[in-house]
Regions:
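Tandem CBS (Bateman) regulatory domains
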Residues: 1-9, 47-78, 91, 111-143, ...
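The conserved cystathionine-beta-synthase
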Residues: 12-30, 37, 80-98, 105-106, ...
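A glycine-centered beta-loop-beta connector
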Residues: 26, 34-49, 94, 102-118, ...
C-alpha cells in the first residue's frame, strides 16, 4: 500500500500568521498539525505540541498568544515522504524518528498531502483477531494526578514525547490529558489573565482544569479494531487501557498501532528474557 492511498489534504498556514489563528484552524479543521508556508513553499510544520512548548516558555508566559507568530513556535526541520512510498516504510520512519506525521511532496517538492499516525491507525480497524493486550504499552507509563500543576504535566509530556497521558488517582483512571487540551488551556489563560499576573498565576492551573473527564476506555481483551475506532472517533491519539473498577493497566495509542503497521501488520515477538 502506498502513501497516496491514505494521505489527506494538507492544511496550510503562513509563517507570519498569529499563533492564535493556527490554534483556531487546528480546532475547526479537527487536525493536529498544519503545514507552514512562506510564499507557497514549505518551511515547517506546527502542531499542538509545538504550541504547548512555546506557550510554556517562561519569558513567553507574559505575552498574549495574540502577539505571537506561527514562526516562533513551528518546527522548521521537516522530514517529507513521497506519494509512492510504502506505508510500512513510512510507519517505520515515524517510529524510528519519533514523528507523529509528515508532509507528502512530489518530485518537484510541491506539497500534495499529509500523512500522520492517525491515517495509519485507521488501517488496523480490520484486524478484529488482534487484541489490545497484544499491542498496548504497559511499562514506563506516564500518568498524572488531577491536582498536579498543568505546567509540570506539560513538561513531563513534552520530555517523554507523549501526545497524551491518563489522569489517575490511586491507580484508577479519572480522565485523559492531551497536548491539545494543554495548548487550549494555556491559550485561554493567555487571553483571560492580564499580562502582569500571568507569571504567578500560571502555576495555579491544575490538570483537572484542562483534562477530559470520562474519556473513552480500552480493554485488554477487546480487538484493536474496536480500540482504534474508539480512539479515532473521539479524535484522540491515546486511550487508557483498564481492568476492573477502571484500574489502569496500560495505554494503547496511535504509536502502538503505527508500530504494528511498521511490523507489516504482525504482533511484535516478546523480547527474550535474560
Amino acid at each position: 500500500m502506498k502513501v497516496s492511498q491514505i494521505m489527506v489534504e494538507p492544511i496550510s498556514i503562513d509563517k507570519d500568521q498569529r499563533l492564535s489563528h493556527a490554534l483556531d484552524i487546528l480546532d475547526k479543521k479537527r487536525v493536529d498539525r498544519l503545514v507552514v508556508t512562506q510564499d507557497g513553499n514549505l518551511v515547517g510544520i506546527i502542531t499542538y505540541a509545538d504550541i504547548t512548548d512555546r506557550l510554556g516558555v517562561s519569558k513567553v508566559v507574559a505575552v498574549s498568544i495574540g502577539r505571537l507568530h506561527v514562526s516562533s513556535a513551528m518546527t522548521d526541520t521537516v522530514i517529507t515522504v513521497k506519494p509512492d512510498d510504502e506505508i510500512t516504510d513510512v510507519a517505520q520512519l515515524m517510529v524510528d524518528r519519533g514523528m507523529s506525521g509528515c508532509p507528502v511532496v512530489d518530485d518537484d517538492e510541491n506539497i500534495v498531502g499529509v500523512i500522520t499516525k492517525r491515517e495509519i491507525s485507521e488501517l488496523v480497524q480490520k484486524f478484529d483477531q488482534v487484541m489490545v493486550k497484544d499491542l498496548m504499552t504497559t511499562e514506563e507509563l506516564l500518568v498524572v494526578n488531577p491536582v498536579e500543576r498543568l505546567v509540570k504535566a506539560r513538561m513531563e509530556m513534552l520530555t517523554a514525547g507523549f501526545s497524551g497521558m491518563p489522569v489517575v488517582d490511586s491507580g484508577r483512571v479519572l480522565g485523559l490529558l492531551t497536548e491539545k487540551m494543554v495548548a487550549e488551556a494555556m491559550a485561554r489563560f493567555s487571553v483571560e489573565v492580564p499580562d502582569k499576573y500571568r507569571a504567578n498565576q500560571i502555576r495555579q492551573i491544575r490538570v483537572v482544569d484542562a483534562m477530559l473527564t470520562q474519556p473513552p476506555l480500552a480493554y485488554p481483551d477487546e480487538s484493536i479494531a474496536d480500540g482504534a475506532k474508539k480512539m479515532l472517533d473521539a479524535l484522540l491519539n491515546t486511550l487508557p487501557v483498564v481492568a476492573e473498577k477502571n484500574r489502569l493497566v496500560g495505554i494503547i495509542s496511535a504509536t502502538d498501532f503505527t508500530r504494528f503497521v511498521a511490523n507489516k501488520f504482525k504482533v511484535p515477538e516478546p523480547e527474550a528474557q535474560d
